[in-house]
Amino acid sequence: MKAAYLDCFSGISGDMLLGALVDAGLDFNLLQRDLAGLDLDEYELYEQKVLKQGIRGTQIHVHALEGHVHRHLSDIQAIIGRSALPPQVKEKSLEIFTRLGKAEAKIHGTDIEQIHFHEVGAVDAIVDIVGAVIGFWRLGIEKVFASPIHVGKGFVKAAHGLLPVPAPATLELLTGVPIYAQDVEGELATPPGAAIVTAYCREFGPFPKIRVERVGYGAGVKDLTIPNLLRLTVGELADEDKGQEGIREGEALTLEVNIDDMNPECYDYLFEKLFQAGAMDVYIQTIQMKKNRPAVLLTVQTPYHKLEEMRRILFQETTTIGLRVYPIKKYMLPYELLTVETNYGSAKVKVAFMEGRACTVSPEYEDCRRLARLTGEPLKQIYEEIKEKAKILLYSTKYPMD
């Protein structure tokens, strides 16, 4: 499972989170293209590499072409609702703005529909929040953890005058979240940052056990006595004990295409491109279409954030003029790859677990084929020996076979 850890040693804000996502690998041009779906032309977006206490980070700037446009929650809901953003991005963005609205309404003692957003309703906050949701979606992050949040101290100037730090709306949003303040003056955690982190994160504490793949630093505007950075670590969640881990549940998309007029020789290249682009599975089935024409049903399973690329490949590399897309639920056993040594050489074996026991042992085909070609021995013989060696290895560990 792809996970992220937010290290909030200098607080969290929407622009810092967006900068951290870009620094961790979110394509900035793709982000701009996605945000264009909001149909807002009152801002310019650019990135800048900066140093904070000697640490390089990415700073995101949202330059408003007009003054602050104050909006009600219903205005923001309308902008997001009519946008060209993916449904899951719309849903999460609306959830975050609703959280903000409820917090502001409680602080001001009024109804959420009467709340008149100030900075939160400005274009920079909209871009920061929707951009962060796009970033988590594009990077395929399924679970988010965070450290206790450094909120700062003192007072901050707002539309209503001087407010204590953390601002009342921020503190309301962080109810139940571990926070702290040290000798750093100023507002470190903002309402948009608090709304985003509490919408995604349910666990606040030390670093989880994660196989690190990417690290990004998002820079704040101010120069502080500590590095004004938000650190984002992205990687695969490493379970304490794969043998005890439960069945994983996930979501994906299925793309289907009916094809009756394509050269069958092209499918090999098509499969290769789809898998290289990140498809989870690709297969074809023989079907009978109208006028009794033989055809194939091409099916592609993909993560949500790969939809655009899969769609482009299918339209580019096949003869279809249309495709079907629908969401699916996936249930998967946890597994790990073992390396076993045989008389023929080393090979990898995929071992799946259920309720603390190894239940499936599958030698990797490519390794078996390589050893068969290398030794001249029958493929099936090599396959069986590798499988037996893997079982012996499992018997000698804490993962017995069923």
UniProtKB/Swiss-Prot annotation:
Naturally occurring in which organism (per UniProt): Desulfitobacterium hafniense (strain Y51)
Molecular function terms, GO-annotated: lyase activity; nickel cation binding
Catalytic reaction list: Ni(II)-pyridinium-3,5-bisthiocarboxylate mononucleotide = pyridinium-3,5-bisthiocarboxylate mononucleotide + Ni(2+)
Coiled coil segments of this chain: none
Gene name per UniProt: larC
EC number: 4.99.1.12
Family: Belongs to the LarC family.
HAMAP family: LarC
Keyword Coiled coil attached: no
Role summary: Involved in the biosynthesis of a nickel-pincer cofactor ((SCS)Ni(II) pincer complex). Binds Ni(2+), and functions in nickel delivery to pyridinium-3,5-bisthiocarboxylic acid mononucleotide (P2TMN), to form the mature cofactor. Is thus probably required for the activation of nickel-pincer cofactor-dependent enzymes.
Protein keywords: Lyase, Nickel
Name of the molecule in the record: Pyridinium-3,5-bisthiocarboxylic acid mononucleotide nickel insertion protein
A GO biological process held by the record: protein maturation
InterPro entries associated with the record: Ni_insertion (IPR002822)
A Pfam family per the record: Ni_insertion
